[in-house]
Amino acid sequence: MFKNNRFETKLAQNRNFRLHLRKNFSNQAMKKYIATLALVFASFFAFSQASCCFVKKDGMQLLASNKTFIKSHALPKPYHHVSKAGGVMVEFKTPDDQMAKGFYIPADKPSEYTLFVFQEWWGLNDHIKREAEHFYSTLGNVNVLAIDMYDGKVATTREDAAKYMGGANPARLEAIIKGAIAYVGPKAKIATVGWCFGGSLSLKASILAGKQAAACVMYYGMPVKEVEQLKLLQTDVLGLFAGKEQFINPTVVKEFEANMKTAGKGIQTKIFDAQHAFANPSNPAYDKAATEEAWNMAINYFKNRLK
């Protein structure tokens, strides 16, 4: 048979080159490739919580256009918070390729529990930071993260508060909460609490937390109404509501209780003889008696579950 020595030599060189590439890729590039792939999958799973209740603006956000609701909120008094517990502002990634912030107080000793604190409609102001620190000092060895749901905006007027709450993008709200869940890690057990707009966010965050959810307290926030969404809850709920308000009124509370029962979830509620925002940290005219009773209920509830 006819032989082409030059061809065979070239072929052998190509084989050796391919073997060199394989060896080089296996020993060097493969390690980088695997590491990169691991990071991609880690990022994917970190933000892979099921979508919950942020497809569209809910009843709470729609209240931002109600003049009576707007006037029901007393303007917060000026207050500057200086943390005595080592609280600091932190940043974390969100699944929409942005960053979010929060006021974070780490536990004195390593703890699997983290309490998410959700702002009123004013934003993450210093009153909320003070309340976050109050929970921290009362509950003991629990991490606390007060999440900034307005991306740095803080209202000092009713008009701005209404604009921020009503104009918040539901998809962005969900992304911020998912980012916070990823920030505390997959092994964290998450409790939630919030007032007004934050009360609604507290319930939604517990749904998004899935199996990581450990406890949920909501102060007079508009409840999730879809039973299929409530079925995703992996914790019971303590709801603290105002009997004298016309918005999230006793009828809304009864509907919430019925929906939770249909969903097969535990719920405890208390309707106080008070107006909306009676316990808001930023409310200078808060109802002292109702606030103290609600606080004690919330603390006892958390202590029974975060242990």
Regions found by a protein language model. Give the residues of each.
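Alpha/beta-hydrolase fold nucleophile elbow
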Residues: 185-195
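Short alpha-helix in the alpha/beta-hydrolase fold that links the catalytic acid
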Residues: 131, 249-259
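C-terminal catalytic histidine-bearing segment of alpha/beta-hydrolase fold enzymes
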Residues: 263-307
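A conserved short beta-strand
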Residues: 212-222
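Serine-hydrolase catalytic machinery in alpha/beta-hydrolase-like enzymes
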Residues: 51-84, 88-184
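Gly/Ala-rich beta-loop-alpha elbow adjacent to hydrolase catalytic centers
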Residues: 194-198, 202
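Short beta-strand/loop motif that positions the catalytic acidic residue
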Residues: 239-241
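Acidic catalytic loop of the alpha/beta-hydrolase fold
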Residues: 244-248
